[in-house]
Amino acid sequence: MAALIKTFLLLFCCMAIVYLINYLRTLWNKSVIFVCDDPNLYPYKKYRTDAGWDIKAAEDIEIEPGKYAAIATGLRVVIPEGYYGHILPRSGLAVKNGIMTMAGVIDSEYRNEVKVLLYNAGDKTFEVKRGDRIAQLVVTKILLSSELLPSEEAIELGYMETERGTSGFGSTGVK
């Protein structure tokens, strides 16, 4: 009987180890890895619960009013499959300086340097200094597959019926 219990415990421990390894592998596969030669340019979150990492400029550059500039960051990023990185604005740049961050999508297989496209909508030349926080990177889950349906079939299956219906812009009111 004691031998049977020892065998059972050994089997249970082995199964627990396999489960733990698979669990850790799952966590690893969902981590975002930043690659940067200059520690001063590492992205960071001020608070653990922030949605995005602040991205810093790797160069000094001036952006004239009405002009665009692609700003080097010195940063490469490894994003897990099933996710993408979205370059988004930092609200202070727009409000205080009229600087707009243009759309930026980083697919999970992209490995080159991340650049941030800024547009100066203000009336003064805007100076970007190395180390300035110029954008934020938010990593978001995506769907990896889709199904195409003819309109008639989608309607027949009830996919197009919702409580909201076809109501769009402004349909929920202001208050």
Regions inferred by a protein language model and the residue ranges of each:
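DUTPase catalytic domain/fold
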Residues: 2-175
